A protein has these predicted regions:
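Conserved donor-nucleotide/metal-binding helix-loop-beta segment in metal-dependent transferases, i.e.
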Residues: 96-114
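A conserved acidic beta->alpha catalytic loop
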Residues: 32-45
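Short beta-strand-to-loop element that shapes/binds the nucleotide-sugar donor at the catalytic cleft/hinge
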Residues: 114-133
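Glycine-rich, basic loop-to-helix element that forms the pyrophosphate-binding segment
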Residues: 59-75
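Donor nucleotide-sugar recognition loop
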Residues: 163-166, 178-201, 205-215
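Short beta-strand-to-loop acidic/aromatic patch adjacent to the donor-nucleotide binding site
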Residues: 80-91
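A recurrent flexible, glycine/aromatic-enriched loop bordering the glycosyltransferase active site
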Residues: 149-171
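Short, well-formed alpha-helical segments that are part of the catalytic scaffolds
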Residues: 11-25
Length: 299
């Protein structure tokens, strides 16, 4: 196997234990990086990892991107080439999911891509193929389809995306270490979007593999007394609970300061579009989702 699995955990080890009990990881190496859990949760995390024979480490530097850098350096020593990262409430549903992905890795056909996303069956409602902050039309900032209808033919093929649906995301270790400048400013939210945009700025495609499917089951967090909708916090108590699991907020401001436009309003890209001329970022901004993918790949 040339693929490994990464978890980044913060005070959510009961959910990690549930995931590991219910998923056949097909013999892949698994690393869990703790993101400043409380002392009692660190103890629980070490116990869960030992129970399931997976590696545990405390973070080196804070934030998702720095954790991925740590994982890349560790995985590379074992000659692994790709990392698959999971949110703890996202579960593979394609039979032999990991084997099928690894077979693609071993063909070498993924070598030139940056990040890879999949078809995420979200809360039993949508098939979420990618995140689309720039493409037109921009109503939802997702490329998504009803879960009960077949995907349109053009989107049923491996295709280029702006940013992956990062309930589960894979990253090319060599490309990441070579091309990505990690920041600790994003502790969780928007970290993967920033990675995808860094790749696009270098004209490296991110792709969706729609025939590899997973189920994102947010409701399961209710069984572990976690916020079901992780970004939502309307009261001081809800804000503290969100930070307990995900770290500091403020990722929208970080995004705007780094990229020059608002993630939630692609009209603001007009002011900075000249900075991205000749890049995939510019190509996606001028692309309409309704015409099909920007580019299709045969794997």
């Amino acid at each position: 196997m040339k693929t490994g699995i990464l978890f980044t955990s913060r005070n959510n080890y009961d959910l990690l234990d549930y995931w590991l009990k219910n998923v056949n990881t097909e013999g892949l190496f698994i690393l869990n990086i703790d993101e400043d859990s409380t002392p009692e949760n660190k103890i629980k995390g070490k116990e869960v990892c030992e129970k399931h024979c997976i590696a545990y480490m405390d973070r080196e530097d804070r934030g998702m991107q720095n954790n991925i850098t740590s994982a890349c350096n560790i995985f590379k020593k074992s000659n692994l080439e790709w990392i698959i990262w999971f949110q703890h409430d996202c579960f593979p549903i394609t039979n032999k999911f990991f084997t099928k992905f690894n077979e693609l890795v071993e063909t070498g056909k993924l070598d030139n891509f940056g990040s890879v996303g999949f078809n995420i069956k979200h809360d039993g409602v949508y098939q979420m193929l990618s995140r689309t902050p720039l493409q037109q039309p921009n109503r939802d900032m997702w490329n998504r389809f009803d879960i009960n209808t077949p995907l349109p033919l053009e989107y049923n093929k491996v295709h280029s995306v702006e940013s992956v649906s990062w309930m589960c995301a894979a990253v090319n270790i060599n490309q990441y270490l070579k091309e990505i400048i990690p920041t600790g400013e994003y502790q969780f939210f928007h970290a993967w979007d920033d990675i995808a945009f860094q790749f696009m700025y270098k004209n490296i495609h991110n792709i969706c593999i729609p025939f590899l499917e997973l189920s994102h089951e947010q409701i399961i967090k209710k069984d572990f007394n976690m916020p079901v909708k992780s970004p939502l916090a309307k009261t001081e108590e809800e804000t503290k609970k969100r930070e307990h699991y995900y770290g500091k907020w403020g990722h929208h401001k970080v995004w705007e300061s780094r990229w020059g436009f608002s993630y939630d309003d692609n009209s603001t890209f007009e002011e900075v579009k000249e900075n991205y001329s000749g890049t995939l970022i510019d190509k996606f901004y001028n692309h309409n989702l309704n015409t099909g993918p920007l580019q299709i790949f045969e794997l």
